Amino acid sequence: MAKVSAAKQNFTAGELTQRLFGRTDLGRYDNGATTVENFLVQPHGGLSRRPGTRYIAEVKTSSAKTRLIRFQFNVEQVYVIEMGNNYMRFYKDGGQIVDGSSNAIELTTTYTTAQVPDVKFAQTADVMYLVHPAHPPRKLTRSSHTSWSITDVDLKRGAMLDPNITTTTLLANGRTGNVNITASASLFTSNDVGRLVQLHKGFAKITSITSATVAVAAVQELEDGRTELMPTYATNTISFHEGDPDNTGLEHNDRLEDTAGNFIDQGFEVGMRVTLTGSTSNNFSNLLVVAVTDTTLVIAPGNDLAAEAAGDSVTLVGSLVADKKWRLGAFFIGSYPSTVAFYEQRLVFAGTSNQPQTMFFSQSGDFENFEIGTDADDGLQYTIGSNEVNVIRYLVSSSQLVVGTSGGEFVVRASGFDEPLTPTNTQIKQQTTFGSAPIQPLLIGNSTLFIQRAKRKLRELAFSSESDSYVAP
């Protein structure tokens, strides 16, 4: 019997699974194929050969896995990064970037062959932020066509864990420079090197561990430019005022007044204990501040000051006392972010092993400042509240921030339709429950293409006006 081969003009169904073999009753059966290899399916049905490739250069180590990453400054300045075992190389305009001796421009990195596939990244202009759970966040910077550098991200004021709720206290032995931080109970481990500590009224970064109760740390710069754990104010504009000048014996508050009006600017706050030296009549230690304005600092009752006019060169400092109010940094050895994105002028980290469902948003327009607060441009932290603890796998910035976790897909947005994201209006809504694999997705148009948790399906997450939510059919 003669064999007949039917002509096929339409392949819009793509490759068919073996489960559909013989299903001639399905309309899409006639539009599919067993294998479509080295061809592109056209929207109108036909096939065309895929574009060819061109040999540019051999990777540094052909026997090891190597990854290619796009680095795009704009549509005219597009680079390809070759990332391999502890190195990066760069390509542009069909050629490898070399130095004056025709040697490939190369950066040394800490990402091993096994870690390269898990590196995630987000770019803004000439800077690309890279994250991997085994390494602190880093940034790749292009200074010129042949000048590239990679450095650790210097996070001076966050992100931080929740405040301490134990009875353990911390005490620093200095206000500036390198200080010893002593804990009242075992607290520090070798994994804390490089970790931030918020204590007293400042931040310090741990540089070494002396014991389980003592860490050496470098004091960090504050937002107002001061680099200290407690304020230090040297001036000759402070006068002293008796709260009970008639000696009635009634309970009263004595006060300091500053004609320069610098108490708040210098960092003095209610609840702080202060020490003063250099005064003719009023040197004191560890007095409690109960009220403060730019020009007035009021101390707690029971502390008597003698009336004294301004003129002495005095130094007022915040006292260093053992304090239960402290916080440890959220990023440390064994718990670094595993995904990163930019959203509404904020750098966002997520997916640490210690807080797998928490996102850390930088301050608006200040990408490396994660200090939280309630002002509209302050940093914020948000933890997904759900029945299961599913690690955040990826972040994708679109009109809303798409968050893929191992158990489902979410979006982060402001509560108001046209409002920017702030610490007081953030909300997160679950959209689907497919779960995502730890593979960086692609944003194409308004759709996010991601790999499902089992790595067997490619799904398209897109907004549906019918359901007023995202769907991934």
Question: For the regions a protein language model found, what residue spans apply to each?
Answer:
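Elongated alpha-helical scaffolds
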Residues: 79, 83, 109-138, 347, ...
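N-terminal beta-propeller domains
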Residues: 1-102, 139-178, 232, 318-396, ...
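Beta-rich, blade/repeat-based domains predominating
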Residues: 66-67, 120, 392-393, 438-441
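Small/polar beta-strand repeat architecture
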Residues: 5-22, 97, 101-119, 155-175, ...
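Loop/turn segments within WD40 beta-propeller blades
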Residues: 74-75, 124, 395-398, 442-445
